[in-house]
Amino acid sequence: MANKFRTLDDVDVKGKRVLLRVDLNVPMENGRVTDATRLERVAPTITELADKGGKVILLAHFGRPKGRDAKESLKPVTEALSKVLNKPVAFADDCIGEPAATAVAALKDGDILCLENTRFHKEEEKNDPAFVAELAKLGDIWVNDAFSAAHRAHASTEGLGHKLPAYAGRTMQAELDALEKALGSPTKPVIAIIGGAKVSTKIDLLENLVSKVDALVIGGGMANTFLHAQGVGIGKSLAEKDLAPTALRIIEKAEAANCAIILPVDATVAYHFAANAPSHAYGLDAIPADGMILDVGPQSVARVHAAIDDAATLVWNGPLGAFEMQPFDRGTVAAAKHAAERTKAKKLISIAGGGDTVAALNQAHVAGDFTYVSTAGGAFLEWMEGKPLPGVEVLRIK
């Protein structure tokens, strides 16, 4: 995979103005960054470019502003980034025009500058050619290190790749290498664990995966829709009953592709959707009519463990139960710990992505033991759905 993209190994950046697209979309409260994970992810690329004598010019969006909005300024994020890098980071209060040009002109080799939120200009999301040209004036090369925004064809995430020599940053490179290991040319057998509440948001994903993986574990609220489609009484559980025909179609498609579908065989049921609500495990033939399935049961967990043991590669998106409330995190935490153990024993390549998935792995204290954890939400999902990502396609060596 790496040889299909130009990386930082292919360019001498000394003295060059490097427009570096990064993901600085971090959570903030009262003007302070509350989680610096994304800043830590981009630090290696920024540091490498600066250490090699490049003039590093950061492009990023923040939030979804409608025009200029002080609450969506990147200035406080720049201050947090400076702490993570342990280097000064200059700031320009616009990403184009005179403020940007003046700040860029002042840079010496190895300096770092962050330009203001690209989304303060509506032309960013329209990928407007005149806006792209304004941005391109500020740089000699463009490096895309924001895989999490690669599913959007915006000016700073895609348009610049047509105007300037384009390269993948180290975060982007790591993500593309991991995804290639996951589904591009994986070590077989491959298992996917797909959870979360709704089938409706993951139809494309499931339909793509059944032709790519050897086994597909379906958990979370999604599994209730599949169980209902197969005639299992699910009580008052969350389900999209109108999608029963879709669920059956996916099962048929899996059978035709020789992909084993692994659904729960028992369930943890409670009568209230609340933390520490009294709960009990039931077989599928005995789910109480007024109960709610909130997690997979112990027999299902054992089946998931066995499926992981049979696999060489695991791709995971979505929790197996209502993991944000104890004790309904048990199934997800147990499976995550099991996958982490197999990974540490060098028996499994494990790749996980999506917001809830990352939160669940952190809750199980195993995120660091997985082969790769993607912080990209939408881009990770669209890639798993088999869709081309504009911000990646533009990096391919033509």
Curated annotation (Swiss-Prot):
It is found in: Cytoplasm. GO terms for molecular function: ADP binding; ATP binding; phosphoglycerate kinase activity. It catalyses: (2R)-3-phosphoglycerate + ATP = (2R)-3-phospho-glyceroyl phosphate + ADP. GO terms for biological process: gluconeogenesis; glycolytic process. PROSITE patterns: PGLYCERATE_KINASE (PS00111). ATP binds at residues 202, 324, 354-357. Gene3D superfamilies: Phosphoglycerate kinase, N-terminal domain. It comes from the Bacteria. Its EC number is 2.7.2.3. Its main location: cytoplasm. Monomer. Belongs to the phosphoglycerate kinase family. This is Phosphoglycerate kinase. It comes from Bradyrhizobium diazoefficiens (strain JCM 10833 / BCRC 13528 / IAM 13628 / NBRC 14792 / USDA 110).
